[in-house]
């Protein structure tokens, strides 16, 4: 089976969630319809991550649920994960703990992000500012010559 891997990164706080939601629905729907199997790699550290996971679940329910995996990639195990592991396992198709777990917690996020980029055929960003972890990850994806989309650019064009 041919697996197409997509990872998502964006700012923690989002000003226009409805426009991003629509763009995510279009992109995820297109991927589900056109690819044999899609692995969606996500985090869970802010509003963009929540929008992405909601869009993945919605599109899988409405379009196709037999050719994808919704994978939460954690940089390390948290107390919250331990306390609610059963709930998280019910929400995501798979949960991975990145091998960055032994690093300092701030460095672990960037190590996890780079691992996700390295695995991806497509990297989707929502980066409006030239600062923060999502921006650093976008710079890394560009350096690695990864195919990427910055949804902030496409939303800016439609204003």
Task: Enumerate the language-model features and the residues they cover.
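Acidic/glycine-enriched connector segments
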Residues: 1-159
């Amino acid at each position: 089976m041919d697996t197409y891997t997509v990872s998502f990164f964006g700012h923690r706080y989002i000003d226009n969630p409805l426009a991003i939601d629509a763009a995510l629905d279009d992109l995820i729907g297109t991927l589900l319809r056109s690819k044999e199997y899609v692995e969606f790699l996500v985090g869970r550290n802010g509003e963009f991550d929540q929008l992405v996971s909601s869009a993945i679940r919605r599109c899988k329910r409405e379009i196709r649920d037999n050719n994808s995996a919704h994978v939460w990639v954690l940089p390390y195990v948290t107390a919250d994960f331990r306390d609610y592991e059963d709930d998280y396992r019910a929400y995501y198709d798979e949960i991975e703990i990145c091998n960055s777990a032994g690093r300092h917690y701030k460095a672990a996020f960037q190590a996890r992000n780079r691992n996700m980029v390295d695995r991806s055929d497509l990297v989707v960003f929502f980066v409006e500012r030239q600062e923060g972890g999502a921006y650093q990850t976008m710079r890394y994806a560009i350096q690695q010559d990864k195919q990427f989309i910055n949804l902030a650019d496409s939303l800016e064009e439609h204003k």
